[in-house]
């Protein structure tokens, strides 16, 4: 292997929008994510409501339905 061409692989903190943080290793200095295992519906068993009513109404208006 050549020396000096590989990025540093260090321990970083991953921050989720829900406020959860955890440690992992990466070549990036900081990682942020929208969904993690603490807030993902598959792991929590809770279903999040996604506002699609606006999209459906816009589709109906656009195509005359």
Curated annotation (Swiss-Prot):
GO terms for molecular function: metal ion binding; rRNA binding; structural constituent of ribosome. InterPro entries: Ribosomal_bL28/bL31-like_sf, Ribosomal_bL31, Ribosomal_bL31_A, Ribosomal_bL31_sf. One of its GO terms (biological process) is translation. Zn(2+) binds at residues 16, 18, 36, 39. Gene3D superfamilies: Ribosomal protein L31. The keyword Transferase does not apply. Its cofactor is Zn(2+). Keywords: Metal-binding, Ribonucleoprotein, Ribosomal protein, RNA-binding, rRNA-binding, Zinc. Binds 1 zinc ion per subunit. Belongs to the bacterial ribosomal protein bL31 family. Type A subfamily. NCBIfam families: L31, PRK00019.1, PRK00528.1. Binds the 23S rRNA. Part of the 50S ribosomal subunit. HAMAP family: Ribosomal_bL31_1 (MF_00501). PANTHER family: 50S RIBOSOMAL PROTEIN L31, CHLOROPLASTIC, LARGE RIBOSOMAL SUBUNIT PROTEIN BL31A. This is Large ribosomal subunit protein bL31. The gene is rpmE.
